[in-house]
Amino acid sequence: MKAIVLASGGLDSTVTAAVAKRDGHDLFFLTVSYGQRHRIEVDRARQVAQALGVVNHVVLDIDLRAIGGSALTANDPVPKDRSVTDRQGEIPSTYVPARNTIFLSLAIAYAETMKASLVYLGANVVDYSGYPDCRPEFLNAFEAMARLGTRSGVQGKGIEIRAPLLSLSKGEIVRLGASLNVPFHLTHSCYDPLASGVACGHCDSCRIRREGFRAAGMTDPIAYAEAEP
């Protein structure tokens, strides 16, 4: 069965792709280059696609900098060195307005074209504590919308939205990825990398990634600008 995977080149989407492959699906990657400051993730998505042997990889250029509203698409500072407590209970400045709504809309369009009935994305419990478009309620509502607003849906075939990491902590995601031989060394998580592409080690995404590998009892294979204290 064909599966569309929203592939950012990050840890979560790569583990998600490995889950879809484990489950016997033919992988079709969709990556969106949206003007993000960490554009290196698009290159990493290409490398991951090659490593996992995807059938096809579409990279769309949609520049969301024209809309703005996020530290990821503007020159606003990316939050650094925030504690777990600091990261809870608020929508961070790295939230990109309606990003998953946009990405999932593109994914179901791709799914219809490829006659695929599955769309995978890497949303998880760490994300939906701060990002409203990673919540289970949102994903369920989007799937219902897709049934009403697509040819596949009105013809009774539908497109299922799957987020297999939704209930997992970052440590559990890392352990799952390790069991599936995920190429962690190819993935990129940092929101504010150096010009060389090396992860800053201080943004929320870097800290969460490091916490995940630490919880899993594993060494993160990527380079950081500074060693973990």
Residue ranges and their predicted role:
Residues 121-126, 170, 174, 183-202:
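Mid-to-C-terminal catalytic subdomains of enzymes
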